[in-house]
Amino acid sequence: MARYIFITGGVVSSLGKGLASAALGALLQARGYKVRLRKLDPYLNVDPGTMSPYQHGEVFVTDDGAETDLDLGHYERFTGVSATRADNITTGQIYKTIIEKERRGDYLGATVQVIPHVTGEIKDFVLSDPGPDVDFVLIEVGGTVGDIEGLPFFEAIRQLGQELPRGHACYIHLTLLPFIKTAGEMKTKPTQHSVKELRSIGIQPDILLCRTEFPIPEGERRKIAQFCNVRPSAVIQAMDSANIYAVPLDYHHEGLDTEVLDVFGLLDQAPKPDLTRWEEISHRLSHPDGEVNIAIVGKYTGLTDAYKSLVEALVHGGVANNVRVKFDWIEGEAFEKDEDLIAVRLANVHGVLVPGAFGERGSEGMIRAVQFAREHQIPYFGICFGMQMAMIEAARNLAGIRQASSTEFGPTSEPIVGLMTEWTRGNEKQVRAEGGELGGTMRCGAYDAVLAPGSRVAEIYGSTAIQERHRHRYEVNIGYRERIEATGLKFTGLSPDGQLPEICERADHPWFVGVQYHPELKSRPFDPHPLFASFIGAAKERSRLV
């Protein structure tokens, strides 16, 4: 039977529970254990699909089409285990399920309550089949202890601690140790009060993971242990790391995996960890041969968490080419307000990337960025919205279709990009009506694509058959293919039925590729996505020229 590790947070949000969970999962894997990571999100949205990126950050899409929390991206990148819709649940999903059951009469007239019905759904999710031979299931609870929204989740994991066999549950609490510079002191009171709140719910943490800017003095460690009722060795220091891929090494050095195994009584029989690959990647990130500067011209650049997987995929591409990747974040709107700014910001970059986005705001600036990259032979990578902008740019400036636009921006006589109303998933036809609901209506998840033999992308992938994850409502209009291809922008990747353009590229350019899907979602530190490795390789080549 699998053992369960519950990771909670206190004091403030955004301390890094997702990263801590992923790092612990990687450490357990390094000892030969099989792991599965899951996330409980207390918000009332059914999923983050319709949430603002500024509110939630990136929406991470799984192979089976679930729109999930960005922490699942950390889980996949650190463990290599692909997540599914069974690995993320929200209060909105739980309430939706309960109300549907109540309307069907499944509760046989009982009064539906938070306990036992809501907590029961949470426990069912936690205990649902993690897969064959899984040794540890790591459950991250979103938010912080004391949040009203989180109370049913904390109650559910408290109950599970009593219901699971003895020695099959471990509680880790991530907290903050602020350093007051004016006093020159590290303060433990916030941690003490956070643990007090957790214990008032009925949960005694086994391990405290303490985020801190400075090393924890031994006296403070003993003080925390005494007041929080844990052993001093279970007060784990979690300082900022040089890069996130050094976090597993740092946590191992502090003894996190050792303490977890000790809680389960497995320390004496646990295999020694093999952290070789983590040491290698950490070394490569710390000792690059060079540096490339990538301009990301987007819509949500004010919050880099909106592009979390994209940033990591570019870092992975840098690892593949042994270079450090620097980011120049640019709002598309900036190029609309000041055209002269384009040359100032882009002339000396080594690559231009336009990522996914929704809506018209900033689109004209992104189109101008595409044009500049094309005309000045700067490596260009367009992802989802970025591919659509490349198509519109070619249509307007090279094919003479001056009114070329997207129906996402409003009515147009030349819909180069239009709303998808039908597509195929497996053997089922998916249909979306004009003006329908937004939630859960996109073309999401893994879909096949066929690449043109001899094309650049076929060479990059080493295959003409690929499968990538998508998240979009709008698609390039295949009816414009002949006119756009006449400009040199070739459709070199299509859906298996030949109706949906998936990839475009230019042969008359050092590196110019647009893709309708999101390759960043499948990139891993130890297996960089080939498109990102190739793009950064082209940027590295340009860095030698400018």
Curated annotation (Swiss-Prot):
Provide the binding site for ATP.
S14, L15, G16, K17, G18, L19, D71
Sorted alphabetically, the keyword list is:
ATP-binding, Glutamine amidotransferase, Ligase, Magnesium, Metal-binding, Nucleotide-binding, Pyrimidine biosynthesis
Provide the residue positions that the database annotates as binding CTP.
Answer: S13, D147, I148, E149, K187, T188, K189, P190, T191, Q192, K223
Q: Which residues of the sequence carry a binding annotation for Mg(2+)?
A: D71, E140
Which residues are listed for UTP binding in this entry?
S13, K187, T188, K189, P190, T191, Q192, K223
Which InterPro entries did the record assign?
Answer: Class_I_gatase-like, CTP_synthase, CTP_synthase_N, GATASE, GATase1_CTP_Synthase, P-loop_NTPase
Q: What is the lineage of its organism?
A: Bacteria, Pseudomonadati, Pseudomonadota, Alphaproteobacteria, Caulobacterales
Domain Glutamine amidotransferase type-1: where?
Answer: 293-545
Region annotated Amidoligase domain sits at 1-266
Q: GO:BP terms for this protein?
A: 'de novo' CTP biosynthetic process; pyrimidine nucleobase biosynthetic process
User: This chain belongs to which protein, by name?
Assistant: CTP synthase
Name the job this protein performs.
Catalyzes the ATP-dependent amination of UTP to CTP with either L-glutamine or ammonia as the source of nitrogen. Regulates intracellular CTP levels through interactions with the four ribonucleotide triphosphates.
**Complex and partners:** Homotetramer.
Enumerate the GO terms in the molecular function aspect: ATP binding; CTP synthase activity; glutaminase activity; identical protein binding; metal ion binding
Q: In the UniProt entry for this protein, what further remark is given in the free-text comments?
A: CTPSs have evolved a hybrid strategy for distinguishing between UTP and CTP. The overlapping regions of the product feedback inhibitory and substrate sites recognize a common feature in both compounds, the triphosphate moiety. To differentiate isosteric substrate and product pyrimidine rings, an additional pocket far from the expected kinase/ligase catalytic site, specifically recognizes the cytosine and ribose portions of the product inhibitor.
Matches recorded under PROSITE patterns? GATASE_TYPE_1 (PS51273)
Cystine pairs annotated here are none
State the activity regulation: Allosterically activated by GTP, when glutamine is the substrate; GTP has no effect on the reaction when ammonia is the substrate. The allosteric effector GTP functions by stabilizing the protein conformation that binds the tetrahedral intermediate(s) formed during glutamine hydrolysis. Inhibited by the product CTP, via allosteric rather than competitive inhibition.
Pathway(s) the chain acts in: Pyrimidine metabolism; CTP biosynthesis via de novo pathway; CTP from UDP: step 2/2
Looking at the record's lineage, which domain of life comes first?
Bacteria
Q: Which reaction equations make up its catalytic activity?
A: UTP + L-glutamine + ATP + H2O = CTP + L-glutamate + ADP + phosphate + 2 H(+); L-glutamine + H2O = L-glutamate + NH4(+); UTP + NH4(+) + ATP = CTP + ADP + phosphate + 2 H(+)
The record places the active site at C384, H518, E520
Q: Which organism is it from?
A: Phenylobacterium zucineum (strain HLK1)
